[in-house]
Amino acid sequence: MGSPSLYSARKTALALAVALSFAWQAPVFAHGGEAHMVPMDKTLKEFGADVQWDDYAQIFTLIKDGAYVKVKPGAQTAIVNGQPLALQVPVVMKDNKAWVSDTFINDVFQSGLDQTFQVEKRPHPLNALTADEIKQAVEIVKASADFKPNTRFTEISLLPPDKEAVWAFALENKPVDQPRKADVIMLDGKHIIEAVVDLQNNKLLSWQPIKDAHGMVLLDDFASVQNIINNSEEFAAAVKKRGITDTKKVITTPLTVGYFDGKDGLKQDARLLKVISYLDVGDGNYWAHPIENLVAVVDLEQKKIVKIEEGPVVPVPMTARPFDGRDRVAPAVKPMQIIEPEGKNYTITGDMIHWRNWDFHLSMNSRVGPMISTVTYNDNGTKRKVMYEGSLGGMIVPYGDPDIGWYFKAYLDSGDYGMGTLTSPIARGKDAPSNAVLLNETIADYTGVPMEIPRAIAVFERYAGPEYKHQEMGQPNVSTERRELVVRWISTVGNYDYIFDWIFHENGTIGIDAGATGIEAVKGVKAKTMHDETAKDDTRYSMPHAPVRFTGRSLLNRFHYFCHALCWNNIFPIKNLSAQKDWTLTYPWCNSVIACYRRA
């Protein structure tokens, strides 16, 4: 699962480095020696803590993951999660600025009073590959005689041991007598290779070319496509027809070509991408300025445009629409704090999370994002197996327009682009509540180098409404609250930012919420309003509530279909999966359910 964002060694080292650079040699002593004092606000914010000052009470509140600290200037003790902690050096005020010793972070935040994070005594067999294991796997495959220098890596992940052995570990703490293995998927030009590596014995177990398949779109493919477009005279001539003379202002979006059985004139065995483009007009939102009816087909192996598909020229809509948020004025609201003054009600032990009666394992996959595994529920003392593994199985976003720039669009965001790789760091207090624990995750990039994603997953407990209430006449009121634990992850795929919540309820149910924010994809049209001559034809495939919007732009019909792969160990009814339509595909041999649902 990775490290807690605010407890990482890198953050600690950075904070201490900053602390030393701002050190104030004050006449304050610790254990008989002179203390090195550093600015509190700067040091703790670099470390990742939230610093608040109550001018009325003359007290600091420091919040970081599972630690809730109150400390007064000059006091010899701090209150950490409701428990007193003796300080080696008190907080000192000088020129209306708080100073702490350079040992303050270790003294307070690693005091042991925060019980959120526990040391893992025996690693869980489904723990994601560590950075060192990723490096080891890459070294082993690179040593193979079959490895070619320009080979890239699409996915490096754990090859899990037998399911029965994993359950025996989770339920009975039996050691798994199987070596750790890595599944390495590579891309050699257009050819896919899957290798299996034995990490314990440091050897290559298999090397298997995969036939009749296409590899994922990798991050460096985006740069390659942009470079090809920028240097193409043919493309420059095409955009010049649309009044664009500087191709460096053209932003490309490489898309998979789809499958049309050769009717589109494209070779199915070639590594091709269709490229649609937008104009950067300087408003921060190139999505609002589509270069319509122009599609470049790029061959990634030949590094060139092999075909340009054009329709009638449509003027690029130029009205500024800075929907990236820079023009948004936040409402003037008073601050809201969510605090847990005595610590968390859940613990994180390695990659295992325990909350109330729930226990589950959490890891990150570069393709599907978070993976929830070995889920159990304590049912009156009996630990029941609920789900072996659950994750996003995949998703597709088809657009309902047969025009030249749209008919092929049916994005397989997870399978084609890797939604785990496109994880968006979570902003505390904005994307997740301020009391959330934010976890870093490590995956491999396309070169096989370990890549840490900061604040990749948020874990938090929240109030979920009243559980029960009854007021009997003449008797005391009886009210109880409902709580739930949320695991949140956000992936940004192009213009959309998808937010996924796994929600664990006290009554033994699991919910999955999925939604999208970001910027809508629009089609450029000639009509400026619905009164224009071309409006009816321009909007024949548009959403009925927004046919022509924002002058020369139309919002097309599209759907977002989400599928989650849920490998249950007990078959429970799947209810209320979506507000529109849902269906399930059940696989009895592994008690697995692929649950699909859509959002317009």
Regions found by a protein language model. Give the residues of each.
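Primary recognition of N-terminal secretory signal peptides and signal-anchoring hydrophobic helices
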Residues: 2-11, 15-122
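Short, structured motif recognition centered on aromatic/hydrophobic residues
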Residues: 38-43, 99-100, 105, 137, ...
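Short, low-complexity cationic-aromatic patches
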Residues: 33-38, 93-99, 173-179, 188, ...
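A short, sequence-level motif marking secondary-structure junctions
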Residues: 72-78, 88-94, 198-202, 229, ...
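Beta-strand/loop-rich accessory regions of lumenal/periplasmic or secreted enzymes
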Residues: 163, 215-600
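Post-signal-peptide, soluble extracytosolic/periplasmic N-terminal scaffold domains
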Residues: 52, 62-66, 79, 118-244
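Hydrophobic, ordered structural segments
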Residues: 103, 107, 111-117, 187-202, ...
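Short polybasic amphipathic segments
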Residues: 59-62, 75-81, 184, 353, ...
